[in-house]
Amino acid sequence: MPTHRVALIFGGQSTEHEISIISARAIANHIDTEAYELYPIYVGHDGAWFKGETAQKVLDLDMPAMLANTSADTIRERLREISFSDPRNRFLFDFSEEGIDVALPIIHGSTGEDGKIQGLLDMFSVPYTGCGVHASAMTMDKETTKICAEHAGLHIAPYTTIRKLRYQQDPQQVVSVILEEFTLPFFVKPASQGSSIGITKVHRPEELAAALEKAFMVDTKVLIEKTIEGREIEVAVLGNDSPVASVPGEVEPGGDFYDFTDKYINGKASLHIPARLPEEVLQKVSTEALKAYRALECRGMSRVDFFIEHATGKIILNEINTVPGFTGISMYPMMMDASGIDFSQLIDRLLQLALEKTLS
């Protein structure tokens, strides 16, 4: 008989909505049903929360196939149809009345990975997996992550930030300053988006304005970042006060860089676990991942991403993802599996860590 009721919270208002559904479905398929009773809660694009049959219908969708074969508008309309099919399934934050023991929020991006849902759960005294408010907010902002990481002694890529208002006031002046400061090619990145949403690698001066416009569509702060010519290495970290790092993995992008399409649609990227590196370098990357995890005060779990620069061999921090993907092709669960913790064990460990945080 299950000993804990787990609220699996998925969906959300970010551009990674569909990826969250895929992650949640994978978790639902791997959770130990003898130990845990699953209570799915779906958060729609509009922020409305749904439980029961409505949440289960969304969870049952074949979202990978829909992403590959269906337009975004059609997917959104189908989700709306399900959401409003039965108003009795609206969820009104009655966690205690529903007997929720612990929450597993798997909402990627804004509202789910930036401290907002963590703060909500804290207010209702519901234990939850992953990082708390402070670490979630810091790691969601790429600039804040860089500041903290550099202070802790990690290497970061040279960058600058541009605010949307400044750009709107004088776009040409901003473009000119960036082109003077950075050697092509360089990256334009929204400060607080995941899954490579809104990112452009700028190769020619005439591409910059469009790249900025694209990034400002999803954020009010944008990073301009030097391109690091090197290998993309990722590490899964798990734990609270005594975190452990997985064997590092390597991403070999199918295109110019590891973008949303590469990650979730065409599958052209090659993934290598363990990364094709000498043992001493693998160990050093894992050590740097733990250093970054602690510097940003992470708990529960995070995926820490690096570049290893070809010219210098430097291990350069790219970003920290506090709610990594849990899809069938996501690096976090695959790296943990390669380190001896399979998907079901990983879910169990995350839930136990959540309860451990509350007790401590």
Curated annotation (Swiss-Prot):
NCBIfam families listed in its UniProt record: D_ala_D_alaTIGR (TIGR01205), PRK01372.1 (NF002378), PRK01966.1-4 (NF002528)
In its UniProt entry, the species of origin is given as: Prosthecochloris aestuarii (strain DSM 271 / SK 413)
Q: Where is the ATP-grasp domain?
A: 146-352
Cite the SUPFAM superfamilies for this sequence. Answer: Glutathione synthetase ATP-binding domain-like (SSF56059), PreATP-grasp domain (SSF52440)
Protein name from the UniProt record: D-alanine--D-alanine ligase
Q: Where does Mg(2+) 2 bind?
A: E319, N321
Q: Where does Mg(2+) 1 bind?
A: D305, E319
Where in the cell is the protein located?
A: Cytoplasm
- Cofactor annotation remark: Binds 2 magnesium or manganese ions per subunit.
Q: What does this gene product do?
A: Cell wall formation.
Classify the source by domain of life: Bacteria
Cofactor(s) essential for the protein: Mg(2+); Mn(2+)
What gene codes for this chain? ddl
